[in-house]
A protein has these predicted regions:
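Active-site acidic catalytic loop and adjacent metal/ATP-binding pocket
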Residues: 1-25
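A conserved long alpha-helix in the C-terminal portion of kinase-like catalytic domains
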Residues: 7, 34-86
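Short beta-alpha connecting loops at secondary-structure transitions
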Residues: 15, 40-48, 104-109
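The catalytic "switch" region of P-loop NTPases
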Residues: 16-19, 28-31, 35-36
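Short acidic-hydrophobic sequence patches enriched in Asp/Glu that either
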Residues: 19-26, 50-54, 112-115
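Feature representing long, continuous alpha-helical segments
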Residues: 25, 29-32, 56, 60, ...
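Composition- and surface-driven signal marking solvent-exposed, interaction-prone regions
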Residues: 25, 74-78, 107-110
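ATP/Mg2+ or Mg2+-diphosphate-binding catalytic cores
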Residues: 88-117
């Protein structure tokens, strides 16, 4: 994130956001990460959650500008992006685990399996 001099958030930056992509990718992947109070590789499954306050605040800010270029169908379906990307990333971690951890960097043998759960 970029902050102003008072410490307020100016914008969220990510290398994925500067290349062409599907709007659900950017929105969904950000929500998957930002609205979860624990890291994606936390083994504390009981603490995994989805913070609706973060979701609503981000969505409001995002749409304040994005509504100018998004299609109505894209706006209507943004809520599904967060679900889709949580599921999709879980499948990617599981596939990498099954394939011998060849894509994602791991810190221990079961790391991608923990991420997938």
């Amino acid at each position: 994130m970029l902050f102003d001099r008072d410490g307020d958030v100016l914008c969220v930056i990510d290398l994925d956001t500067v290349m062409p992509s599907f709007v659900f990718s950017d929105f969904g992947d950000f929500m998957r990460t930002a609205a979860n109070p624990v890291p994606e590789d936390s083994p504390e499954y009981d603490k995994i959650d989805f913070n609706m306050d973060i979701y609503h605040a981000f969505t409001e800010g995002y749409l304040s500008t994005a509504k100018e270029f998004l299609l109505p169908v894209e706006i209507e379906n943004l809520p599904y992006a967060a679900r889709l990307f949580a599921f999709m990333q879980s499948v990617r971690f599981l596939c990498d685990y099954i394939n011998g951890d060849v894509y994602y960097k791991v810190s221990y043998p079961e790391h991608n399996y923990v991420r997938a759960r």
